[in-house]
UniProtKB/Swiss-Prot annotation:
Protein's recorded name: UPF0316 protein LA_0606
Lineage of origin: Bacteria, Pseudomonadati, Spirochaetota, Spirochaetia, Leptospirales
Membrane-spanning ranges: 47-67, 73-93
Any Pfam family the entry gives: DUF2179
One Gene Ontology term, aspect cellular component: plasma membrane
Species in which this protein is naturally found: Leptospira interrogans serogroup Icterohaemorrhagiae serovar Lai (strain 56601)
Keyword field: Cell membrane, Membrane, Transmembrane, Transmembrane helix
Length: 199
C-alpha cells in the first residue's frame, strides 16, 4: 500500500489541510504581531524587529495560498478565523509574559503610611507623598515594579485596605533596574541595627 500527501485539487487538501494550514499560520503570525506591537511600546526594539521579520514571512506564505485559491471559501474563513484567534491568543501570551515595568499608584486617606511600610518590608521601593482629595487629606503611594509582580503587590495592599483606590500605568522607560528585588527600607533598617549591635 502506497501513501502520498494529498496534492492541490484533492478535496482533502483543498477543504481540510489547506484551510487548517492557513488558520494555524494566521494564528501564529497575528499572535507574533500582537506581541511585537506591545514590545515596541516597551522599548524592546531588537526583539520586535526579529518578530516582525517572522510575522511578515508567515503572512506572505499564507496570503499566497489564499490568492491561489480564490474560489475556496474555506480559505477565507480560515484566514479571518486565524486573525481573530491570533489576536486573542497574542493578548493572553502578552499577559502571561508580563514584559516590562508598571507604575502602581495608591491613594489612601487613612492607611497610606502602613501600605508603604508593608510594601517596603516586602522589598518594593516606595515613594509616599501627601495629597488632598475631595474629602480631605490623603496619602499617595508610588512604586515601580515588574508587571509580573503586580498581583503580589496588590495582595499586600489589599490586606491593609481592601477597598483602596489604585491605578496601574505602563512605565515605558526606567533609568534603573535595581529598584526591585532589593531589601525594603524597614528590612534594611533592621539589618543595620543588627550590624551595629554586633559591632
Amino acid at each position: 500500500m502506497e501513501f502520498s500527501f494529498p496534492l492541490p485539487g484533492n478535496p482533502i487538501f483543498d477543504y481540510v489541510l489547506l484551510p487548517c494550514f492557513i488558520f494555524l499560520s494566521r494564528v501564529t503570525d497575528v499572535s507574533i504581531g500582537t506581541i511585537r506591537v506591545i514590545l515596541l511600546t516597551r522599548e524592546k526594539k531588537g526583539i520586535a524587529a526579529s518578530l516582525g521579520f517572522l510575522e511578515v514571512l508567515l503572512w506572505v506564505v499564507v496570503i499566497t495560498q489564499v490568492i491561489k485559491n480564490l474560489n475556496n471559501v474555506f480559505c477565507y474563513l480560515a484566514y479571518a478565523g486565524g486573525f481573530a484567534t491570533g489576536t486573542f491568543i497574542g493578548m493572553i501570551l502578552e499577559e502571561k509574559l508580563a514584559i516590562g515595568f508598571s507604575l502602581l499608584r495608591i491613594i489612601s486617606p487613612q492607611n497610606g503610611s502602613e501600605i508603604a511600610d508593608k510594601l517596603s518590608e516586602a522589598g518594593y521601593r516606595v515613594t509616599i507623598m501627601n495629597g488632598h482629595g475631595s474629602r480631605g487629606p490623603v496619602k499617595i503611594v508610588f512604586t515601580v515594579l515588574k508587571r509580573k509582580k503586580i498581583d503580589q503587590a496588590m495582595k499586600i495592599v489589599q490586606n491593609v485596605e481592601p477597598d483602596v483606590f489604585y491605578s496601574i500605568e505602563n512605565a515605558r522607560r526606567t533609568n534603573t533596574t535595581t529598584f526591585e528585588d532589593s531589601p525594603g527600607l524597614l528590612r534594611r533598617g533592621i539589618l543595620e541595627k543588627i550590624l551595629k549591635i554586633r559591632k
